[in-house]
């Protein structure tokens, strides 16, 4: 591992690291915020997954999460949104290829060689964080848009791994919206049954009651993608039918930007703290 940056921040440290990923077959960067130590108890971790076109720095520089994370004693880990590099398959569109990994394991050439973000987030990155930093094994997950999709599927596919999950303007039903259809047909092929494994609504309907964890979703009602790409009411209905403890908050006037995230990130951190710090 190589440290790329380090900055003092709210008595803690904001760092950026590069490491060689055996899962993704390329070098990867991630950002991490380490809160000031409180006692000898290792702090819990909140993983943040960003959206289309982003990397590990968008949340770090725009969300303003460090102040409350420092107060609460929560480590923040921000991975990149895809594998990257000259040898990594790419596409000219903003919503496919590098910067748009969709947090799944691709099965189609040429994507399958590198695009295994699900395995990276489930196994390799948490193991690396555990081995290199003084953190506890208690963790939660959150994300925005494509990253909200990622956070939800990570939680739904891994019962017991996370104490809680939250999302801002997530893509909840990718099998049925243009962003998801484009990505899934490219990364996974045309068999739509294979897509269901990566769709939060399908996973919610297939979930078991004993695996449910507290879930918070915020959605701006002035989001230009709300009707065509996001459709959170579809997941809310699935959660209702499964008696899954999910709160969906529609926030008047807010759009899809980091101004929206910055406005409510404190709520999300305090939501996760209730369960992370038990």
From Swiss-Prot:
GO terms for cellular component: cytosol. The keyword DNA-binding does not apply. InterPro entries: AB_hydrolase_fold, Esterase-like, S-formylglutathione_hydrol. GO terms for biological process: formaldehyde catabolic process. Its EC number is 3.1.2.12. Pfam families: Esterase. GO terms for molecular function: carboxylic ester hydrolase activity; S-formylglutathione hydrolase activity. The keyword rRNA-binding does not apply. The active site is at residues 145, 223, 256. It catalyses: S-formylglutathione + H2O = formate + glutathione + H(+). It is an enzyme of class 3 (hydrolase). It comes from the Bacteria. Keywords: Hydrolase, Serine esterase. Belongs to the esterase D family. Serine hydrolase involved in the detoxification of formaldehyde. Hydrolyzes S-formylglutathione to glutathione and formate. This is S-formylglutathione hydrolase YeiG.
């Amino acid at each position: 591992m190589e440290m790329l940056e380090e900055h003092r921040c709210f008595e803690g440290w904001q760092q950026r690291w590069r490491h060689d990923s055996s899962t993704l077959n390329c070098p990867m960067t991630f950002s991490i915020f380490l809160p000031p130590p409180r006692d000898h108890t290792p702090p819990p971790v909140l993983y943040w997954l960003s959206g289309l076109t982003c990397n590990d720095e968008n949340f770090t520089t725009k969300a303003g999460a460090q102040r409350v994370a420092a107060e609460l004693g929560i480590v923040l880990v921000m991975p990149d949104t895809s594998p990257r590099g000259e040898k990594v398959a790419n596409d000219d569109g903003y919503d496919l290829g590098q910067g748009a990994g969709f947090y799944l394991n691709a099965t189609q050439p040429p994507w399958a060689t590198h695009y295994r973000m699900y395995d990276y987030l489930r196994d390799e990155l948490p193991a690396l964080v555990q081995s290199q930093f003084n953190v506890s094994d208690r963790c939660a997950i959150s994300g925005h848009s494509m990253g909200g999709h990622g956070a939800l599927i990570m939680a739904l596919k891994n019962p017991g791994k996370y104490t809680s999950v939250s999302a801002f303007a997530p893509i909840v039903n990718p099998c049925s919206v243009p962003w998801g259809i484009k990505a899934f047909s490219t990364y996974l092929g045309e068999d739509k049954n294979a897509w269901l494994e990566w769709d939060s609504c399908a996973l919610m309907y297939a979930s078991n009651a004993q695996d449910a964890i507290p879930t918070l979703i915020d959605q701006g009602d002035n989001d230009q993608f709300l009707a065509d790409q996001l459709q959170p009411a579809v997941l809310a209905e699935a959660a209702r039918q499964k008696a899954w403890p999910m709160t969906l908050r529609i926030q008047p006037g807010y759009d899809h930007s980091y101004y929206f995230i910055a406005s409510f990130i404190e709520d999300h951190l305090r939501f996760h703290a209730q369960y992370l710090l038990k």
